[in-house]
C-alpha cells in the first residue's frame, strides 16, 4: 500500500510557457449541482444531486511579486493552463518512498486579478482567479478525472459517467 506524503515541487504553464514567481495553486473543487425536493411521502427535504452536473469550478494562482511583465501578461490572459507537481509516497510493503507525477490541464476564463499588497520587507502576494470550463487530472500518466462542461464529458478513471445519459439524447 502506498501512503501519500506531500508535494515536493510544482510548476505552472500558461499557453505552453513556464511561469515563475507563483507561491501556490488552488485546484478546482468539483461540486455537483443539487436541487431540493419535498412533498407528500417525504419527511422533510432531500437535497438531491443532479447526475454529473458540475457547478462552477475555480482555479486560483497566488504569486509572490509581479516582477516579470511577461509572466503577468500570461497569467492575465490565461486560457490553457497546465499545472505539474510531484508528490512522494511511502510504500508500506518495502518501506521505501516513491515519486509520483501529477498534471492538471485546464481551459479557463480569467475572472479576477488581485494585485496584492505593497508593504516594505514583504511579498506582494498577488492572485489570479479563473473560471474552469474543462479540467483533466492525470497521475503517473493515467487520467483520473476529466470534466469538460461544454462537450458533455465527465469521466472518472477513464469511465464515462455521462454515457448512459448521452446515449438517450
At which residue positions do the language-model features occur?
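Polar/acidic, low-complexity leader/linker segments enriched in S/T/G and N/D
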Residues: 1-35, 164-168
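A generic structural signal for short beta-strands and their flanking turns/coil linkers
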Residues: 8, 55-59, 77-83, 100-102, ...
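Beta-strand elements of well-folded, non-transmembrane domains
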Residues: 14-16, 63-67, 85-91, 106-112, ...
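A positional/architectural concept
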Residues: 26-54
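Oligomerization/assembly interface segments of phage tail-like spikes and tubes
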Residues: 47-67, 122-135
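Catalytic micro-motifs at enzyme active sites that drive phosphoryl/nucleotidyl and oxygen chemistry
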Residues: 70-71, 91-94, 113-120
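Short, acidic/charged, Gly/Pro-enriched secondary-structure junctions
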Residues: 73-107
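Mixed-charge, glycine-accented linear interaction segment located at domain edges/termini
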Residues: 109-169
Amino acid at each position: 500500500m502506498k501512503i501519500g506524503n506531500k508535494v515536493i515541487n510544482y510548476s505552472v504553464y500558461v499557453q505552453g510557457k513556464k511561469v515563475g514567481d507563483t507561491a501556490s495553486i488552488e485546484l478546482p473543487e468539483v461540486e455537483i449541482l443539487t436541487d431540493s425536493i419535498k412533498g407528500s411521502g417525504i419527511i422533510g427535504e432531500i437535497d438531491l444531486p443532479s447526475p454529473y452536473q458540475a457547478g462552477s469550478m475555480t482555479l486560483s494562482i497566488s504569486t509572490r511579486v509581479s516582477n516579470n511583465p511577461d509572466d503577468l501578461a500570461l497569467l492575465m490572459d490565461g486560457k490553457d493552463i497546465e499545472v505539474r507537481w510531484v508528490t512522494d509516497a511511502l510504500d508500506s510493503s518495502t518501506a521505501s518512498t516513491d515519486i509520483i507525477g501529477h498534471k492538471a490541464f485546464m481551459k479557463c476564463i480569467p475572472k479576477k486579478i488581485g494585485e496584492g499588497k505593497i508593504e516594505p520587507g514583504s511579498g506582494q502576494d498577488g492572485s489570479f482567479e479563473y473560471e474552469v470550463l474543462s479540467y483533466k487530472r492525470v497521475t503517473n500518466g493515467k487520467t483520473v478525472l476529466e470534466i469538460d462542461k461544454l462537450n458533455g464529458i465527465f469521466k472518472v478513471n477513464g469511465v464515462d459517467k455521462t454515457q448512459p445519459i448521452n446515449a438517450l439524447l
